[in-house]
Curated annotation (Swiss-Prot):
This is Cytochrome c-type biogenesis protein CcmE. Residues 156-166 have a biased composition (Basic and acidic residues). GO terms for molecular function: heme binding; metal ion binding. Residues 1-8 are cytoplasmic. NCBIfam families: PRK13254.1-1, PRK13254.1-3.
Amino acid sequence: MNAVRRKKLMWVMFTLAGAAIAVVLVIYAIGQQTDYYFDATAIAQGEAPQDKRIRAGGMVVAGSVQRAPNDPLSVEFAITDFQSTVPVTYQGILPDLFAENSGVVATGKMQGDTFVAGEVLAKHDENYMPPEVAKSMKENNRIGAVPSSEQYNPAEKVHETKTLQQ
């Protein structure tokens, strides 16, 4: 092999190696930004990883929204998929369309049995339900009337008190 061919071969090899490294880095970066969706039943069964960012979706349980008396930005509520209920804590301003008996998708991490949300997204009109929530409820044949706070599983303790304790 002469020097010119060797030089071209080396150039091609370095180019391919660089492209392969770039592809691996892009795939890794995309994987790090992926938030997996879990419904309330999957979270209650322990399928959601602890201390890893995930998305949790469901309907806000009526009567579960509680604000701390001395911290108006601290909110606790529960989400349900009509089979299980998961307590959620959130520190921040809730969207204007956030309401009980409406669909939400929250991004955050599991800490024990509580979902600590860093972001809460609410539905944008009365007929909208987040696609992940609608699919989950359809799979469980649970689309229908939204349960009140008395109808969701009372065996699952959501809150110890009606107000947050400091």
